[in-house]
Amino acid sequence: MQLNPSEISELIKSRIQGLEASADVRNQGTVISVTDGIVRIHGLSEVMQGEMLEFPGNTFGLALNLERDSVGAVILGEYEHISEGDVVKTTGRILEVPVGPELLGRVVDALGNPIDGKGPINAKKTDAIEKIAPGVIWRKSVSEPVQTGLKSIDAMVPVGRGQRELIIGDRQCGKTAVAVDTIINQKGKNLFCIYVAIGQKASSIMNVVRKLEETGALEYTIVVAASASESAAMQYLAPYAGCTMGEYFRDRGQDALIVYDDLTKQAWAYRQISLLLRRPPGREAYPGDVFYLHSRLLERAARVSEDYVEKFTNGEVKGKSGSLTALPVIETQAGDVTAFVPTNVISITDGQIFLETDLFNAGIRPAINAGVSVSRVGGAAQTKVVKKLSGGIRTDLAQYRELAAFAQFASDLDEATRKQLERGRRVTELLKQPQYQPLQVWELAVALFAANNGYLDDLEVAQVLPFEKGLRDYLKSKHADLIKRIEDTKELSKDDEALLHTALKDFKKSGAY
């Protein structure tokens, strides 16, 4: 059978007219390869960096590498059922997590799904996990304190609302303990907390959650957990998800505190993803943008102005500034703070609390090295009474450590040096504190007052802590009005100083310690 050209054209025209063409907005591609949770996709020409991709079986992924002829994506969740040739669709959405007060008291994964067995979370709002930090114009200087309840931190390296204070040290030297004590101490202080656990053992995370529950701190805390058994993608995303949950409170004129425990594990997870995506490795095999990984996260912790809050809430909240305070944790190897990730995070943050294994093993806990630890902005936020009383304590302790090292070789020391060493020993003892027992402002003030005015000088070192505890009990029973004044005003007037001198003398005479 032969068709002439006119018949062929008629046939084509009729076929074209009868064609039902519906344009699908979504772009589609095909899986080329799947390895270690990384998928290479061909044909996604319209995809955005960081866009959510839909795989078969209701599985989602994140587009991270946009190359000329393919897209590199990381799978969020299980990937065993994904195979070569599967169809992948773009969603046109960036990854979002649920936010809001409904999350308080709950344990969630990096995507905001509940993992505590307490049922679904009915959050009314979701927000993108990647956001640009507030600009310079919208920020305010740090002026209100975050009371950690730890004598050595509140006196020597104070933390303010909106500050980023790094907790750095080797493994097993009390970094998590400092962070958890800070969360426990926020009870009744109108500060919401987010604890982000990255790459930790599930049992360790459970211990923290149990302790927060026992102390009643879980009711104002959100726990975001990406344990060691979860994929590198989840460990990489968890800090950003937690930060978005904290920003919800910051942007509505409230105060929030976020602990990232720890960012070393996040850097390891990101390094793993980057190497699998075939990005060129740099120093210590980290990718070139590992600094940006942490800087864009920590810059989102800020104190924002009243104008920012009013603009963000469309005038619903007026005259209130909000803050997000960050306590990132970094684990060092053998005390080496000059490694790549520690130096990066030290340069991004507003100070660091340096914990030492030697001090920890010597029974000085929290094991804070006074000479290296610093708070670059927290001094402005310190309460007046603590600022007044803690003036020289950091210098004294740093000098004491230097002298103590020198005194091991010197046999005959002059009187002034001997006095400084004795005072240093007692102050070091005074700053020791058991875990899960944070102190109130008046308790810290009284302890510092006793040390500054020489009331500890004639005590044996072993008597210092019993003396401090006995003094607190004595003041509670005999001078409750003085305690209330210090707590309410956060100041120590001349009259109160005289009263405190009298109380201390009376207590020492009684010998009830």
UniProtKB/Swiss-Prot annotation:
Taxonomic path: Bacteria, Pseudomonadati, Pseudomonadota, Betaproteobacteria, Burkholderiales
Chief place of localization: membrane
GO MF annotations, alphabetized: ADP binding; ATP binding; proton-transporting ATP synthase activity, rotational mechanism
Family stated for the protein in its record: Belongs to the ATPase alpha/beta chains family.
Membrane protein topology class: Peripheral membrane protein
Residues marked Required for activity (site): S373
Gene3D superfamilies per record: 2.40.30.20, ATP synthase alpha/beta chain, C-terminal domain (1.20.150.20), P-loop containing nucleotide triphosphate hydrolases (3.40.50.300)
Domain of life according to the entry: Bacteria
GO (cellular component) term, any one: proton-transporting ATP synthase complex
Residues reported in the UniProt entry to bind ATP: G169, D170, R171, Q172, C173, G174, K175, T176
Xref: InterPro entries: ATP_synth_asu-like_sf, ATP_synth_asu_C, ATP_synth_asu_C_sf, ATP_synth_F1_a_nt-bd_dom, ATP_synth_F1_asu, ATPase_a/bsu_AS, ATPase_F1/V1/A1_a/bsu_N, ATPase_F1/V1/A1_a/bsu_N_sf
One Pfam family linked to the record: ATP-synt_ab
Catalytic activity: ATP + H2O + 4 H(+)(in) = ADP + phosphate + 5 H(+)(out)
Sorted UniProt keywords: ATP synthesis, ATP-binding, Cell inner membrane, Cell membrane, CF(1), Hydrogen ion transport, Ion transport, Membrane, Nucleotide-binding, Translocase, Transport
EC number(s) stated in the UniProt entry for this protein: 7.1.2.2
Protein task: Produces ATP from ADP in the presence of a proton gradient across the membrane. The alpha chain is a regulatory subunit.
Enzyme class, UniProt record, top EC level: translocase
UniProt-annotated location(s): Cell inner membrane
Record note on quaternary structure: F-type ATPases have 2 components, CF(1) - the catalytic core - and CF(0) - the membrane proton channel. CF(1) has five subunits: alpha(3), beta(3), gamma(1), delta(1), epsilon(1). CF(0) has three main subunits: a(1), b(2) and c(9-12). The alpha and beta chains form an alternating ring which encloses part of the gamma chain. CF(1) is attached to CF(0) by a central stalk formed by the gamma and epsilon chains, while a peripheral stalk is formed by the delta and b chains.
Protein name listed in UniProt: ATP synthase subunit alpha 2
Keyword Transport found: yes
